[in-house]
């Protein structure tokens, strides 16, 4: 199966230096330009990723590609939180046709 992601609107969720859920939510809110009412919890993140009305404008028609970088340290220090985050990202992709999420490998990429 092949999918062309070339035209997707891409944003980078850089988790370098993020050590907790609060930091992850703040980064996500910033890079996705989420509204002030974004609840900064797992359910709100899932809802926002699945709701194209809160996506950056170019992504609504073209689709959204979220590239997650620098996630290794967060995953190592917070394995439970990382498991939840990765489950949320996976579920959002499963629910939303125009959404793709990629984990950038590099450094200590141990999945």
What is each residue range found by the language model?
Residues 1-111:
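Positively charged, polar, low-complexity stretches
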């Amino acid at each position: 199966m092949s999918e062309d992601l070339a035209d997707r609107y891409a944003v980078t969720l850089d988790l370098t230096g993020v050590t907790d859920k609060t930091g992850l939510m703040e980064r996500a809110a910033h890079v996705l330009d989420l509204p002030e009412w974004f609840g900064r919890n797992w359910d709100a993140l899932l809802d926002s990723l699945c709701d194209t009305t809160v996506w950056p404008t170019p992504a609504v028609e073209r689709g959204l590609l979220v590239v997650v970088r620098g996630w290794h340290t967060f995953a190592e220090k917070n394995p439970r939180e990382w498991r939840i985050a990765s489950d949320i990202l996976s579920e959002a992709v499963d629910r939303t046709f125009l959404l793709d999420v990629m984990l950038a490998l590099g450094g200590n990429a141990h999945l």
